[in-house]
UniProtKB/Swiss-Prot annotation:
This is Proline-rich nuclear receptor coactivator 2. Residues 60-75 have a biased composition (Low complexity). It comes from Bos taurus (Bovine). Pfam families: PNRC (PF15365). GO terms for biological process: nuclear-transcribed mRNA catabolic process, nonsense-mediated decay.
Length: 139
């Protein structure tokens, strides 16, 4: 089946780009690569320069910026934390409550070969005794 037959399908040629456009694209990539190298060198030396004067002032002030006015709404909401959580307490949580055990109908059934089908009271006592001895619990 099929062999070495190859078909030459003519594709549209995109080599009509002028030399000036090629040189411009090469120059752009060179500029981008040189900028990336400069950034990496600065990071390697451990120097990070921030051109923002506001950031520099904030760093000098120890992160305390005195230019921001106090917002009374913000302060009043923080003064009473019960207002922050009031809407959350009224909502009903639809998930499982871990204080209550799940109903047996929800639990998966064990495989039939794990447990015998019929339980005699003596079998149950023997099983509990064996489990307690395996777990080293005093009877």
């Amino acid at each position: 089946m099929g062999g070495g037959e190859r078909y030459n399908i003519p594709a549209p040629q995109t080599r009509n780009v002028s030399k000036n456009q090629q040189q411009l694209s090469r120059q752009k990539t060179k500029d981008q690569n040189s900028q990336m190298k400069i950034v990496h060198k600065k990071k390697e030396r451990g120097h990070t320069y921030n051109s923002s004067s506001a950031a520099w002032q904030a760093m000098q002030n120890g992160g305390k910026n005195k230019n921001f006015p106090n917002n009374q709404n913000w302060n009043s909401s923080l003064s009473s934390p019960t207002l922050l959580f009031k809407s959350q307490t009224n909502q009903n949580y639809a998930g499982a409550k871990f204080s209550e055990p799940p109903s047996p109908s929800v639990l998966p059934k064990p495989p039939s070969h794990w447990v015998p089908v019929s339980f005699n009271p003596s079998d149950k006592e023997i099983m509990t005794f064996q489990l307690k001895t395996l777990l080293k619990v005093q009877v």
